[in-house]
Amino acid sequence: MNQSKNRPAMTWMFSLLAATAVLGGCATVETRPTAAVNASNPLVAQAGHLARNNADLSGAQRTENERQIERLLSQLDNAALAREAEALPVGDPLYNFVGRQLMQRGLPLPRPFDQTSNWRYQASAQRPPADSDGYRPPLKLAVLLPLSGSLATAAAPVRDGLLAGYYGETRRRPEIIFYDTNGTAGGTLAAYDKAAAEGNDFVVGPLGRDEVSALFGKDALPVPVLALNRGNVAPPSGTVSFSLTPEDEGVAAADYLLERKALRVLAIGGGDDSQRRAIAALKERLGARGAQVTDTIGEGTADLAPFASKEGGIDAVFLAVKGSAARGLIPKLALAGLADKPRVATSQLLSGTGKPEQDRVLDGIAFPSESWTSGGVRGLPPAPGVAAGLPTARGPAARLFAFGYDAWLLSAYLERLAGRSDAFVAGATGVLRVDGFGSVLRTPAWSTFSSGVAVPLADASRR
């Protein structure tokens, strides 16, 4: 059921990673100043009423109530949102909603999130005090992953990325034990119970959405958890969820476009589930901020002119497609008069690319990427060098490798992130923060194509 860290084949590899890291293991945790102002707004009064009733709701009713709160707050401009946050007293149920909006917009919080009876995080008192940068890892770390079963292929790069962070750290490290969930709800619950019984003081995992939902639905979770996916219920108190989901990319794309004043967006997508989910998230986020998706059309649509010529025009195009499909769409966008409009895609754009002579047509399209693969991250050797020696860090797996590395960082810095208004970690997947509801908010790096090669996007917002 479990695997100890003493695996020779892994140890030498990650010892090598530790030795080659320029600044091994030191994450960047920074602070930003805040300003104090006071104001009030009727939209906030309505949102506050909903927030006060939120704790009494559950399931779909609670989800819809929270969406209504988000929609109301999204109508406030940045200055008004900041003023209202400053005016809310400690313990007001609305503060965590307002704070999350501020965080999503890259704005400072006036104070830390309120840790309420619904959600709070507290590290084990037995841990040694935190270092000056907030580093305070567990004493004994359990990692719950599907090391066998249908998700084992996805779990391998997550495991290796986590171990790269672990072996690259030169300060105190916890004992680490891997538990196989078999990729099932039952296997997850059994693995968690075993990890708790064996004295682990923190759990990373599980990985699958159904596994996370099963764990979050458990009556009691005596050991805090960093789940590596979103469940179908909110994280229970003491647990945090971190994920790389299509919804996250849709939201990131919406925020990117909103920052560039794009209010009317044409969405083009393929047929798979992740592409549909990204578009749905984009549409919801734009709608909440007063913008809109004018049409959602399939990647095989022959003539885009009728959609481009609608009254009000098109400000930008969102592409939830793979690179091969995007190459066929670019000439159609030009024929429809949309060649000069901002174009944003999901990270799937990279799929099916790699030949610059073919990919030049993709030049200028912005897409979310990982800090590590797009420009490097402190604490990890450059991605090409790691990929040369480690198959689980190559190609599409590099994203999951970076995800695993960040899971290690979060396990070590979570207390700092949950307890300070100005704390963030510069991770391998992007800039990481924790909101007042137990969710890790990730601001991705951004990339584009130049001469057919993916490169960092210099003018993208990196809040």
How would you label these PLM feature ranges?
Residues V22-G25:
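C-terminal motif of bacterial Sec signal peptides marking the signal peptidase cleavage site
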Residues T153-P157, G168, R172-V233:
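Beta-alpha junction/loop-to-helix N-cap segments that form part of ligand/metal-binding clefts
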Residues A27-E30:
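Bacterial signal peptide processing site
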Residues A195-G208, L226-L228, R264-G269, G312-A326, ...:
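Periplasmic-binding protein-like
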Residues A383-A458:
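Segments of small-molecule ligand-sensing domains
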Residues T239-I297:
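An alpha-beta-alpha
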Residues G287, I314, I330-Y405, G419:
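Extracellular/periplasmic periplasmic-binding protein-like sensory domains
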Residues V233-Y256, D359-S371:
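Short beta-strand elements at the ligand-binding edges of bilobed clamshell
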